[in-house]
């Protein structure tokens, strides 16, 4: 059963969703959304004998803290995860899945060698020069970000959430997704993440990715209007030890369109002994 827990990381209360009764740790990362994107698949992943942990980065979701632009880059978020894993008491290899910008953070964590990453999955995540999308890129202008209010962030995120779900959604469900950004602190953290969005980070990973032997899985909603499947197809062709699983009739958050298929693909991949 899915539950929310909290751990102290450097004096900041960090929230995460988890499920199951233990097993090998699978770290689940969000991007421009929050841990809520993983909720539909947590029980399914746990059913494979795994311990899923869907963390809210500092300043996001239900976590405390607030991100600055300098703290919100892919490399800095990757480095922060080392402290989070230490706070969890995690020792030994870890497995990671990332959605959206979290997909870039997952790849960076794998390549940085600060912790041993045994397997990596990217779910409709950033790669190559696929990002930032226009709805995020416009906030990279400091003047635009400075003039943006909490209500502006809420309005922009509403548009993105409705589009990303890729299916009809009730007002209650949309409100649940948007709720963290009603806090001005969390809205400012989102603006920091947008301000730090730069595809040079994923492009700089390419030489190391081309040499990487770590098993990798791409799980992709085929109808994603943000991170289009052609990027995933290219990645699967070019990057060693990569397999692509397509989720039909699914958008940017395929966990919401076909949770059984997504949880099944991730559970099988992360539970593999080889």
Residue ranges, per PLM feature:
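N-terminal cap/lid segment of alpha/beta-hydrolase-fold proteins
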Residues: 1-13
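Active-site loop/oxyanion-hole signature of alpha/beta-hydrolase fold enzymes
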Residues: 10, 17, 54-97, 264
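Conserved HGGG/HGGXW glycine-rich cap/lid loop of the alpha/beta-hydrolase fold
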Residues: 18-62
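Gly/Ala-rich beta-loop-alpha elbow adjacent to hydrolase catalytic centers
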Residues: 98, 102, 106
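Flexible "cap/lid" loop of the alpha/beta hydrolase fold
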Residues: 111, 118-148
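Conserved alpha/beta-hydrolase catalytic His-Asp/Glu region
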Residues: 131-133, 151-210
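Conserved serine/cysteine hydrolase catalytic core
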Residues: 186-237, 246
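Catalytic active-site module of serine/aspartate enzymes centered on a nucleophile-bearing elbow/loop
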Residues: 242-274
């Amino acid at each position: 059963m899915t539950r929310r827990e909290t751990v102290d990381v450097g004096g900041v209360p960090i929230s995460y969703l988890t499920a199951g009764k233990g097993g090998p740790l699978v770290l689940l990362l969000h991007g421009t959304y929050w841990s809520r994107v993983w909720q539909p698949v947590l029980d399914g992943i746990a059913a494979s004998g795994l311990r899923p942990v869907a963390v809210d980065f500092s300043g996001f979701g239900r976590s405390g803290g607030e991100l600055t632009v300098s703290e919100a880059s892919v490399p800095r978020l990757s480095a922060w995860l080392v402290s989070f894993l230490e706070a969890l008491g995690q020792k030994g290899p870890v497995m990671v899945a990332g959605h959206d910008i979290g997909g870039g953070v997952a790849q960076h964590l794998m390549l940085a060698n600060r912790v041993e990453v045994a397997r990596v999955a990217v779910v409709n995540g950033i790669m190559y020069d696929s990002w930032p999308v226009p709805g995020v890129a416009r906030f990279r202008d400091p003047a635009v970000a400075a003039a943006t209010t909490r209500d502006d962030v809420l309005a922009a995120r509403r548009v993105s959430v409705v589009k990303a779900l890729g299916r009809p959604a009730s007002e209650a469900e949309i409100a649940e997704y948007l709720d963290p950004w009603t806090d001005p602190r969390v809205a400012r953290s989102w603006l920091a993440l947008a301000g730090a969005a730069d595809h040079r980070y994923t492009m700089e990973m390419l030489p190391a990715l081309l040499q990487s032997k770590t098993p990798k899985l791409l799980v992709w909603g085929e109808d994603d209007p943000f991170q289009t499947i052609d990027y995933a197809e290219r990645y699967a062709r070019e990057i060693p030890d990569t397999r692509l699983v397509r989720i039909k009739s699914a958008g940017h958050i395929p966990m919401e369109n076909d949770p059984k298929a997504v949880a099944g693909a991730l559970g099988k991949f992360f539970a593999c002994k080889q």
